[in-house]
Each structure stands twice: as C-alpha cells, then as structure tokens.
Amino acid sequence: MTNPATSIASIQADHAVKLLAPLTDLVIKAGEAILAVSRKSLQVQGKADGSPVTEADLAADRIISEGLARIDPAIPVVSEERAEQSQPPFSGSFFLIDPLDGTKEFIAGRGEFTVNLALVSEGIPLLGIVSAPAIGLLWRGVVGRGADRRAIKGAGAEAPTPIRTRPLPIRGLPWNAAVSRSHGDPATEAFIASRPGAVRKMLGSAVKFCRVAEGDADIYPRLSPTCEWDIAAGHAVLTAAGGRVTDSKGAEIRFGQARPDFIIPEFIAWGDPTAIP
C-alpha cells in the first residue's frame, strides 16, 4: 500500500494558524465526549503493549478522526488508537493525536488527563493543542507565532491568555521539575538528583509540558521510552512558548521517522533553552 503522506506538501505557520480555531473546537468536543463517559460503568481493556484503553479513548478518537477528515482531508492522521494502520516514515505534514493521554489518570478519577493534537511538518511539531477537560484548561501554540492558555469550562469561558516560559533560576535557588505521577524511572530520578535544589511537581499526561510552557515549572525530563503521540502536541506548545525539547544530549527529536511503534527513547523539555548542554 502506498503511504499517502509522501505526496503531502509541508504545511507552514500561516496555514497552521488558520487551522488553529477549528482544531481547537474539535479538541474541546472530544474532551466533552470523554467527560460524558461514566466511570461507574467504565470498561477497561488492555492493548497489545499492556496499556489500558476505554470507551472514552475510542469515543474521542472517533470524534477527532471524523473532524479532521472534514477540516483538511488531505492531511494524513496518525492516532494512538489506530497506529497499526500508519506507515511511516512521513514526509511533508501529518496530524498526530492521542485522544486520551493519561488513561490511567482518567480511570483513577484524577483530572490530569488530556486530549492531544499536533500537526507535524517535516518531522517537527508545528502546531499543538493540549486540552485538560476535567480541569477546564486548554493550551495551544503554533511555533513562531506564540502560545496561549484558555479556560474551557462554563458558558462563555475566557479569552486566550498568552503564555511564555521563564528563565531557569540562578544556581543555588530552587527550581521546579515536572515529573510523571505514573511513570517514574531511575534515569530520570538520577538526572534530577544531579541538579540540586529541585522541587518536584507530580503531574499527569501532557499537562507537564504545559506547566513548563506557562512558566509554572522549569523542566520536564523523561529518560525512559514513550510514544510520539504522547509528546508531539506538548512539544509544539512548549516550543511556541519559548522552550525546546531535546534528547539528553541536546539533539533535536524528529517525528514520523519510522521508529518501531513510534517510540521516543527519551526527551527533556526545557523552559529555558540556554540551559541545554
């Protein structure tokens, strides 16, 4: 089968900005569908990799996939829930989505799960939207055009507020490290321990990227494997807000490059790019 992405031209920032409003509406709609699923009758199934999936994941995936087909049917879509149907490597542009990031948080009744949607262009996330429907916040950004946060709960919600990363505190002062509530690992702990003065902020899902993007945390390291759809949207939001995402050696991370199972071996999300080694 021919990979349809090979014929899709790269989308630039001007086009991405035009897509931002309809994509935002779509992500909000997917979040509403997740909240409509009753946890009392929630049925949890296991994927081949052992991770959980629920009817909320599938409902959000269906809404986003159908919406993207209406908004721009020429752009290929890679979704966590249908990853086996995708054929990387991808040239040009493609959508990369995680319909429910933090399924464990959702199952446990915690609010830090998100809907993640990214537009990747030439291997780099260009546009990102991260919605946390249970806590009523949405973050979004287009690289080179800035990032913002908005409330999405209530009848009118609020206008978007621009966000920006903050400089890393000077040596000797406390700094905030966003760390996973559900996926701790020895390498990440060693990285944080090697930089004295860290205050750990335990968070779930892609909310960690967004807290760095809005200047509430300084760094988000994860030195263990995760998947491209887990980080692409947060990557774009953080980069648009002034940060960067690299591997532990400071190298750029590229997406859609035919890594097995879309695995990202490691990454560090930096609020202050001057801190990158």
Question: Can you describe what each PLM-predicted range is?
Answer:
Residues 1-25, 32, 190-193, 209-277:
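Oxyanion/phosphate-interacting regions
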Residues 1-100, 121, 186, 190-193, ...:
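N-terminal subdomain of lithium-sensitive/metallo-dependent phosphomonoesterases centered on the IMPase/IPPase/PAP
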Residues 3, 117-210, 258-277:
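Acidic beta-strand-loop-alpha-helix segment within the catalytic core
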Residues 34, 57, 68, 103, ...:
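Residue-level signal for inorganic ion chemistry
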Residues 43, 76, 176, 198-199, ...:
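Conserved beta-strand segments of alpha/beta enzyme cores
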Residues 91-133:
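Glycine-rich active-site/cofactor-binding loop and its immediate structural neighborhood
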